Amino acid sequence: MIEWSKLIKGTLIKRYKRFKADVKLSNGHIVTAHCPNTGSMKSCSDPQRTVYLSKHNRPDRKLKYTWELIEMPTSLVGVNTGIPNKLVKKSIENRLIKELSDFEKIRSEVKYGENSRIDILLENKNVKTFIEVKNCTLLEKGICYFPDAVTSRGLKHLQELQREVHQGNRAVMFYLIQRMDATRFEPASHIDPVYSEELKKAYENGVEILAYDVNIDTKRIAINRSIPFKL
């Protein structure tokens, strides 16, 4: 579980230049917040929606606010892509993810592959488990999709995970759904067909797929349950 610092409520005016969002606070002031998400944010960036910001007082920060959550009709949605790695690691450490509970050592951001870093590496006497974590927010008719934009980086990760399996290690693609209203996970073949086909290939070659959603409110976010997937 990760607890938010006190969040500030506002109304989204617009997201622009990918990393910025203008928000009208409840006191009427308009602020520019950092948007910690490089994706298209389809289905979770509608203007006039209620959003929640964290505030940071570090003197070196140009933007004092960070956009954390948005209220959509059927769920709060977490937009901060820095959250999934932290939440998944904490959940693994607390043995909350049964598929990833057999380990003696856990590390983050370990170099591997071709100039890459694996999000989480689990180790025991018998095997290394390489875990790549992806943030998922795109929802259409109850199905959560990844990616929400073409991703060459994501494609590279799938290829590197397959190489780890070939070398005798375990590899896992972990899709964290930062919302509570998804019934299933699927690769977004209508957005990035190349990634979708590579995910199918990776699965056939032994890369495991896990999709979990969260419980989320304005005080905290916690891992919730395993969600079925369809390739």
Predicted features and spans:
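Conserved catalytic cores of phosphodiester-cleaving nucleases, focusing on short active-site segments
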Residues: 10, 118-148, 161
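Short nucleic-acid-contacting surface segments enriched for D/E, G, S/T with interspersed K/R
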Residues: 39-52
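Acidic-basic catalytic patches of nuclease active cores, encompassing PD-(D/E)XK
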Residues: 42, 74-107
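Nucleic-acid nuclease catalytic cores
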Residues: 142-152, 162-191, 213
